[in-house]
Amino acid sequence: MRFSLKLIYLFYVAYLGFYIAPTKLVRNKIKSWLLNASEYDFTDIKEGIRLHLNESPFEPPQFIIDAVKMYLSKGNRYQHPDLLEKYRELAAEYSKVEPENIYPSVGADGSIRAIFYNLVEPGDTILTNYPSYSMYSVYSSVRGTKVIKVNLKEDNEWWKENTDDLLAQAEKVELVIIDDPNNPTGSPMLNGKKELIGQLAENTKGFVVIDEAYYEFGGYTVSPYIYDYPNVLVVRTLSKAFSLASYRLGYTIANEEIVKALMKSSTPFDIPLPSLIAGITALENPSYIKDVVNIVNRNREILYQGLKNLNLKVYKSITNFLLIKDNRNLQEMLMRHGIAIRKLYDNFYRITIGTEDQCKMVIDKLGEELENSNSK
């Protein structure tokens, strides 16, 4: 009996080793920086009011939906490359540049990913702000690069760029990437100032990327400067003001040689046909985004004033979201009412601007929760 148990034990150990050893062997083959890389911190909800992802609260216009429907039956075929060229031409016209200056991508993230994978290499150093869009750090860690972060300066109800530090640190890096307006503060950073862009472009050893995901809300751009400073790139998206988040449409505005280099790592089929049709149709008729921006701006003021009236520390914004600082769990309070917001760091929260009714609901429900917490 004792002999049989010993055999069973040895067999069990061998069985485990057979499966564990290959797993360890595979891990040893994966680059160390990739094993230790950061992941996108993402929590979603299936139902409720979505004010946690900076989405547009408005559905795409019916004319875009109708255009997409016409192509759904063609899913068995790859789209003709002419469609991608049409998208590039329209994005160029919208951005007041030439088509050869447009790199089309699967969302702005597709552009950022292409930049990290093609214009920097493991061991390079990236410069960005803190706080800023979290995917910069994710892509940096996945690529095995180092990161220098310049802390933004709090200035009453706004946040400001630490310009002197940014320019000094730029001399040490291969890539500078700045979201302007900034996410998650909602504040303008470089304000499209040509002098600052020029200094950054001249100081850095590599490239300067300005992420203009919220360009339509901010109203300023550095895109004209790509002709004066050929190492400057501008990233844009159709996810925000264009209300096309799940269609995953974006583009980069850059020097022709940079665009050619980025295009080598992509195909004419990367953007799915329905998305391409949505993007083309939207860029052919972009006037609707003015209404989106105007309504969001109006609702932002409603939410801002309402939160201020609740004695919350809320920062001003030129985007489609607000930043709040509070040591209570505002996320948990609002989730009890089916409202999702984004919890960030050090008691900071980001709330997307929704419809007027949604903004008023946030104010009402948060007011109830805060009153209850104060009475305990």
Curated annotation (Swiss-Prot):
Annotated GO MF terms: histidinol-phosphate transaminase activity; pyridoxal phosphate binding
Please state the pathway this protein functions in, per its UniProt record: Amino-acid biosynthesis; L-histidine biosynthesis; L-histidine from 5-phospho-alpha-D-ribose 1-diphosphate: step 7/9
Q: What InterPro entries does the record point to?
A: Aminotrans_II_pyridoxalP_BS, Aminotransferase_I/II_large, HisP_aminotrans, PyrdxlP-dep_Trfase, PyrdxlP-dep_Trfase_major, PyrdxlP-dep_Trfase_small
Coiled coil region boundaries? none
N6-(pyridoxal phosphate)lysine PTM positions read 240
Give the enzyme's EC designation. Answer: 2.6.1.9
Pfam family for this entry, one = Aminotran_1_2
Give the top-rank taxon of the lineage listed in the UniProt record for this protein. Archaea
Catalytic reaction equation(s): L-histidinol phosphate + 2-oxoglutarate = 3-(imidazol-4-yl)-2-oxopropyl phosphate + L-glutamate
The cofactor required is: pyridoxal 5'-phosphate
Question: Is Amino-acid biosynthesis tagged as a keyword?
Answer: yes
Signal sequence region: none
Q: Which GO terms describe its biological process?
A: L-histidine biosynthetic process
Q: Which UniProt keywords are present, listed alphabetically?
A: Amino-acid biosynthesis, Aminotransferase, Histidine biosynthesis, Pyridoxal phosphate, Transferase
Tell me yes or no: is Amino-acid biosynthesis among this UniProt entry's keywords: yes
As for family, the record states: Belongs to the class-II pyridoxal-phosphate-dependent aminotransferase family. Histidinol-phosphate aminotransferase subfamily.
HAMAP family from the xrefs? HisC_aminotrans_2
> What's the protein here called?
Histidinol-phosphate aminotransferase
- Give the species this sequence originates from: Saccharolobus solfataricus (strain ATCC 35092 / DSM 1617 / JCM 11322 / P2)
Coding gene?
hisC
